[in-house]
C-alpha cells in the first residue's frame, strides 16, 4: 500500500515538474519527487542511500535551483512558449525511453515480452544463514575501499581539479576587467578630493 502511494506520488510529481507554469512550483514538485524516492529506498531497505538522496539532492541541489529561480525573474509566458517549442522533441525522446525500458526489463510481469528461460534447473538456496548480515553502509564501504578504490581516488582527483580550476578562473587577471586598488582607495585624503566650481561652469579646479 505504501509502495503504491509513494510510486504514484513520485509519478504525479514528476509530471507536474514539467507541466507547472510557475518555475518555483516546478522546483517544489522536484523536491517532492526526491522525497518520494527516498521513501521508496527506505522501503527497499536502502536507508543509507535514502539519506544521501535527502542530503545531496534536496539539501543542496534542489535548494540551489529554488534560489536561482527565485532570484531570476523569469516570465511565465516565455516558459510556456519554450515548452511548446520543444514539445515534439521531448515526445520523441519519451517514446524512445519507454521503448528501451520495455526491452531492458525482461520480466514476466510484462505480457508483451515473452521470456524464454529454463526454470526447471533452478534451485532455491537460502543464503541468509550462510553469510554474515551486513548493513548497507558496511557493504558500500567494503566495495568502495577494496575493489573500487582506484576509481574512488580518480573521482577525488577529478573533484580536486574542478575545485582548483574554479579558483584559477576567478583569480585570472585581464586588462579588460576594471578593478579597484583597495589600498590606494583607502589612502585617499577626502579633503583634497573635493572640487571647487567657479562661476564659469566650464572651469573646474
UniProtKB/Swiss-Prot annotation:
GO terms for molecular function: NADH dehydrogenase (ubiquinone) activity. It is found in: Mitochondrion membrane. GO terms for cellular component: mitochondrial membrane. It is a multi-pass membrane protein. Keywords: Electron transport, Membrane, Mitochondrion, NAD, Respiratory chain, Translocase, Transmembrane, Transmembrane helix, Transport, Ubiquinone. InterPro entries: NADH_UbQ/plastoQ_OxRdtase_su6 (IPR001457), Nuo/plastoQ_OxRdtase_6_NuoJ (IPR042106). PANTHER family: NADH-UBIQUINONE OXIDOREDUCTASE CHAIN 6. Belongs to the complex I subunit 6 family. NCBIfam families: PRK06638.1-4. A stretch of 270 kb of the mitochondrial genome is duplicated within the centromere of chromosome 2 resulting in the duplication of the gene. The expression of the duplicated gene (At2g07731) is not demonstrated. It is also probably not RNA edited and therefore differs in all the positions known to be edited. This is NADH-ubiquinone oxidoreductase chain 6. The lineage of its organism: Eukaryota, Viridiplantae, Streptophyta, Embryophyta, Tracheophyta.
